[in-house]
Amino acid sequence: MPNDIRVLLLGGTGRTGGRVLARLLERGVEVRAIVRSARRLEPGTANDTRLTAVEADPLSLPRDELLELVRGCDAVVSCLGHNTDLGGIFGPPRDLVARMTRRACGAVAVLRPAEPVKFVLMSSVSVNRPDRLDTRRGAIERAAVALLRGLVPPAKDNQDAADFLCSEIGQADRFVRWVAVRPDTLVEGDGSGYALHEGLVSSLARPDKTSMANVARFMCELVTDPRAWDEWAGRMPVIVDAAVSV
């Protein structure tokens, strides 16, 4: 039941992370959230007794403190990302998402939980599945994405985080199971409905839209609904708003 679930949320004040936090609390989930500034939490969220907010730079958090935050959690949800200004795109840390993914999964491995911990990563459609499984992406588009990763550090960071989950955690890890959620172009909106796909459903030239509310809803479903988790564990679903899915 949701009120028996404990989650560590990485990034709880961003546009998507804030929505994930609010939804988890609405469902009765106990949340430990690492945030850069607790002042950015919504008043109704900040005062919730089920929330423990820790102000910290996640990459600078001491190992022992991270272990204590992970200890006893059923899931770790990462909504970390880079700011969209020049400093956020090209400034340090360029490997925020990938390095924190490694740190969190490493902490789980040290703790050796009796049951695998769920790791839910907010990723992007610019991220490729391994071994060219995204067959809709042709050679030209793959080249464009590779160029993007070479020029724009957040694109490489997102790919590195997903590659770590696919290649190093894999499908048979004893302590971590994972899902990498790949939204298309993120937009505001109430998130009236969404569609999930195994692979890409649009091209870079004609992207679909994904409301941040829908991303938050699906990520929370993965945490609280065993059926959703069993369907998508170890996979990289693409999520788009239902009205624009193909």
Predicted region positions:
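N-terminal Rossmann NAD(P)H-binding glycine-rich loop of SDR-like oxidoreductase domains
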Residues: 2-27
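Structural motif
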Residues: 6, 74-75, 118
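SDR active-site strand-loop-helix element
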Residues: 10, 34, 79-80, 119-125, ...
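Mid/C-terminal beta-alpha module of Rossmann-like enzyme folds, strongest
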Residues: 14-15, 203-246
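NAD(P)H-binding glycine-rich loop region in Rossmannoid oxidoreductase-like domains
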Residues: 33, 39-103, 110
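Conserved Rossmann-fold NAD(P)-dependent oxidoreductase catalytic core, especially the SDR/UDP-sugar
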Residues: 87, 91, 102-152
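Glycine/proline-rich active-site loop of Rossmann-fold NAD(P)-dependent oxidoreductases
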Residues: 129-133, 190-195, 224-234
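Conserved beta-loop-beta element that borders a ligand/cofactor-binding pocket
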Residues: 162-188
